[in-house]
Design a protein with these regions (language model features):
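Hydrophobic, aromatic-enriched interface-forming segments
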Residues: 112-195
Length: 298
């Protein structure tokens, strides 16, 4: 039996809960959603997929993404919910020896972007928000740290985890990176009507930073679109869309929109990856749909 999940905070908490609820000894297999969608991941019998698209080779599946819904029978639970961790917690709640309710509630808020302006601008004052920002998704693989966090969350309370020397160092780094990221966002983001478009393709090193900062910097925008090269050889482009968490007037289901371009996700946040040769066709279409701001769920 093996856990297969994605390397974000929700995925890490999914792993914590599955390790606690089930008899699992194998290490986590960390993968990105797009790799599952493209059939690039080796999935085998006994695997438990969490927070990722369904693969019919797995034995159990837990997810909450709008565009990942399937209409055939499977073992596990699919539910539109704030987090996949919350889906797992509800399913196995009678098996836990520790009280994970606070962790799951925090994960729900973080993964669904249900955050206050103070939490976005001053994450260092909010423990779980800060801890989640030490997990950098989409950067270089960081498996030892992801595995370490799983162990810490299974054993200790939040303050003990925040005081861990490595976590402490990463917290300091997050604050430094957020300051730099603010500068990058201002330089590389433009407004097209109510759409803020952040284009990092001109940068050799993609900056890491608080994904919610852009909403505080461009309050008139209802949705942000971020563009970057996925690979160093610039053959693939990654696009992510997020509804503003402070100006909630975006009518476009982001997951459904990007499903038309090989991606998917939630109503309020989604991503896709495609060949750079398709950028001149795909990007204007995506931007046009966001500018029209029409409900695309019907």
């Amino acid at each position: 039996m093996r856990i297969v999940t994605r390397p974000d905070f929700d995925g890490i908490v999914c792993a914590v809960l599955l390790y606690e609820a089930l008899d699992i000894s194998q290490p986590v297999k960390w993968v990105e959603p797009n790799a599952v969608q493209r059939g690039l991941v080796e999935i085998r019998k006994g695997d438990i997929i969490a927070n990722l698209p369904y693969d019919d080779r797995c034995s159990f599946w837990f997810d909450h993404h709008y565009t990942n819904r399937i209409y055939r029978s499977f073992k596990g639970v699919f539910k539109i919910a704030p987090s996949a961790a919350g889906v797992i917690y509800e399913h196995y709640k009678d098996r836990f020896k520790r009280d994970y309710s606070e962790l799951v509630t925090a994960t729900d808020r973080i993964d669904s972007a249900d955050l206050s302006l103070d939490e976005v601008l001053h994450p260092e004052k909010h423990g779980y928000v800060m801890l989640s920002m030490t997990v950098v998704n989409g950067g270089e693989p960081d498996e030892p740290y992801w595995e370490k966090l799983i162990g810490l969350l299974r054993q200790y309370d939040l303050q003990r985890i925040l005081d861990d020397p490595e976590v402490k160092q990463r917290r300091r780094h997050v604050i430094e990176q957020n300051d730099k990221y603010t500068v990058y966002l201002k330089k590389n983001t433009r407004l097209d009507k109510h759409v803020s478009i952040t284009d990092f393709r001109n940068l050799e090193n993609i900056p890491a930073g608080n994904r919610f900062l852009v909403y505080s910097l461009f309050p008139e925008s209802v949705v942000n679109m971020r563009i970057r090269y996925e690979t160093k050889n610039k053959e693939m482009i990654a696009v992510s869309i997020g509804h503003s968490i402070f100006n909630r007037c975006c009518n476009v289901n982001a997951g459904l929109l990007l499903a038309d371009f090989g991606g998917g996700g939630h109503r309020g946040a989604a991503s896709t990856r495609f060949e750079s040769s398709k950028a001149d066709t795909y990007l204007p279409q995506i931007i046009d749909a966001l500018k029209k701001n029409k409900n695309n769920e019907n």
